Curated annotation (Swiss-Prot):
Its EC number is 6.3.2.13. This is UDP-N-acetylmuramoyl-L-alanyl-D-glutamate--2,6-diaminopimelate ligase. It comes from the Bacteria. Pfam families: Mur_ligase, Mur_ligase_C, Mur_ligase_M. The gene is murE. Keywords: ATP-binding, Cell cycle, Cell division, Cell shape, Cell wall biogenesis/degradation, Cytoplasm, Ligase, Magnesium, Nucleotide-binding, Peptidoglycan synthesis. GO terms for cellular component: cytosol; plasma membrane. Was identified as a high-confidence drug target.
Length: 535
């Protein structure tokens, strides 16, 4: 096996483990439960031999499912899966002590348990592959009682989910949202460690949303979620595709594999296929996805023939933009959003097409769309300084290019502070350096989330890409992210733009085996306030 293949295999295992995942957080209050024997029959799991196994299986009722022993509630089935450093079966004792009534594991897990479990143990050769459907059964197939909208793509998922949720709420719908920034149920926020939660957590969340009166859920669907079965057991009313560019090649062996993971939400032969597809066709991948899907509703903000199009795009004095959305009937709708950038016109068009599909007209959605701001997405930090200061989540080449292109203007200077994540696709680093040096006047290369990699080596790769440009940009290396932000702020003159890119809404910096509190928005605000005090 090549080093690249070994790295991808290791990353898949690490992602599957999710040792950093947050607690479950949201569960239904009332679950009827399912007999363990029926669940075993459903997924084709065998009963492992051991004390008290066969006699009690028929009498066991499962009322919850979890992957984490510390999240077990009485009545749960504990799914003990393979991890990057340990097998979940090692935590079976803790799970049982917390009330687990059964265990689902693989043959390696059975060997680890070695007949020591005082509850029935179901064994399956690939338990992760059946976990989503099993959890959906335990929680009463909640997605069948909701309108579930799944949004996938490299960039724009978070913004589009926020736009859709805003449109739903403006139309009087009770909406749920699941994504990178967190989970929202009827306006109440919960944190999230994953773009798309693990299958048992997702099904529990959906069931809890049903209990709370939610009628429509909009969620981000990552390629990891599709490849690892996190959305198995979920019925999607609408699947939407935003775009595709280089990302996650530490997990996917190729861009083709990355595309195919996304395509499982649209392919007519896929068990995950959404009933209706909405596809932005402004890149090659979008056009290929529209061809793959059956009767896709197409969207274009780039003057391509599509069901939904944008015309008369113009910036507003408040820093947003307005445009006319042309619907499939050829009717124009005046739309205003507080988000800059042509890519956000595309995101808004995707949202409008989704909303129309689920019965919300543009006119109903407009009051919500025009007020929405997305945390950490071109989020403006204003402390009275004479220049524009922004924080954005752009952490991949095309996202960085899009944001810098939006902000660049011949009459003002542009500074960008960014790094690259460790233990992630290293092939993104040099291209990001090149893009920054091509489009910005000041490039400050700093640390992002180095994780377990040497941060100096990461910065070196970015700097090598920037050096290839050989232009007029000033390129500096400042390892400490706080100092890097302060440097860019001190450099800025009235009318300039300072962008802090890569971490967006995140509130911690991962490196050296720990997470330290760090929020780009807080640090940028502090730097601006210090600047004003000195003035």
């Amino acid at each position: 096996m090549s080093s690249l293949a070994r790295g991808i295999s290791r990353r898949r295992t690490e992602v599957a483990t999710q040792v950093e995942a947050a607690p479950t957080g949201l569960r239904p209050n009332a679950v009827v439960g399912v007999r363990l024997a029926a669940l075993a029959d459903q997924v084709g799991a065998a009963l492992a031999e051991g004390p008290a196994q066969r006699a009690v299986t028929e009498d066991r009722t499962v009322t919850g499912v979890t992957l984490r022993a510390q999240d077990v509630s009485p009545g749960d089935l504990f799914a003990a899966l393979t991890g990057s450093t340990t097998h979940g079966a090692r935590h079976v004792g803790d799970a049982i002590a917390r009330g687990a009534v059964a265990v689902l594991t693989d043959p390696a897990g059975v060997a680890e348990i070695a007949g020591r479990a005082a509850v029935p143990v179901l064994v399956h050769p690939a338990p992760r592959g059946v976990l989503g459907g099993l959890a959906a059964t335990v929680y009463g197939h909640p997605s069948e009682r909701l309108t579930v909208i799944g949004i996938t793509g490299t960039s724009g998922k978070t913004t589009t989910t926020y736009l859709v949720e805003a449109g739903l709420r403006a139309a009087g719908r009770v909406a749920g949202l699941i994504g990178t920034i967190g989970i929202r149920v009827g306006g109440a926020d919960l944190p999230s460690a994953l773009t798309t939660p693990e299958a048992p957590t997702l099904q529990a969340m959906l069931a809890a949303m049903v209990e709370r009166g939610v009628d429509t859920v909009v969620m981000e669907v990552s390629s990891h979620a599709l490849a690892l079965g996190r959305v198995d057991g979920t019925r999607f009313a609408v699947g939407a595709f935003t775009n595709l560019s280089r990302d996650h090649l530490d997990f996917h062996p190729s861009m083709a594999d990355y595309f195919e993971a996304k395509a499982s939400l649209f392919d007519p032969d896929s068990a995950l296929r959404a009933r209706t597809a909405v596809v932005c066709i402004d890149d090659d991948a979008g056009r290929a996805m529209a061809a793959r899907a059956a009767d896709a509703i197409t969207v274009s903000a780039a003057d391509r023939p599509a069901h939904w199009r944008a015309t008369d795009v113009a910036p507003t004095d408040a820093g947003g933009q307005q445009f006319t959305a042309i619907d499939p009937a050829g009717v124009g709708h005046h739309i205003g959003i507080r988000l800059p950038g042509r890519y956000n016109v595309a995101n808004c068009l995707v949202a409008l097409a989704i909303l129309d599909t689920v019965g919300v007209s543009p006119e109903q959605a407009v009051p919500g769309l025009r007020e929405i701001r997305v945390p950490g997405r071109l989020e403006q930090i204003d402390r009275g300084q004479g220049f524009l200061a922004l924080v954005d989540y752009a952490h991949k080449p095309e996202a960085l290019r899009s944001v810098l292109t939006t902000l660049a203007h011949p009459d003002r200077r542009l500074a960008v502070v960014f790094g690259a994540g460790g233990d992630r696709d290293p092939g993104k680093r040099a291209p990001m350096g090149r893009i920054a040096a091509q489009l910005a006047d000041l490039v400050v290369v700093t640390d992002d989330n180095p994780r377990d990699e040497d941060p100096t080596a990461i910065r070196r790769e970015i700097l090598a890409g920037a050096a290839e440009v050989g232009g007029d940009a000033q390129v500096v290396e400042i390892a400490d992210r706080r100092d890097a932000i302060r440097h860019a702020v001190a450099w800025a003159r009235p009318g300039d733009v300072v962008l802090i890119a890569g971490k967006g809404h995140e509130t911690g910096q991962r490196g050296g085996g720990r997470v330290r509190p760090f929020d780009d928005r807080v640090e940028l605000a502090a730097a601006l306030e210090a600047l004003e005090r000195r003035a």
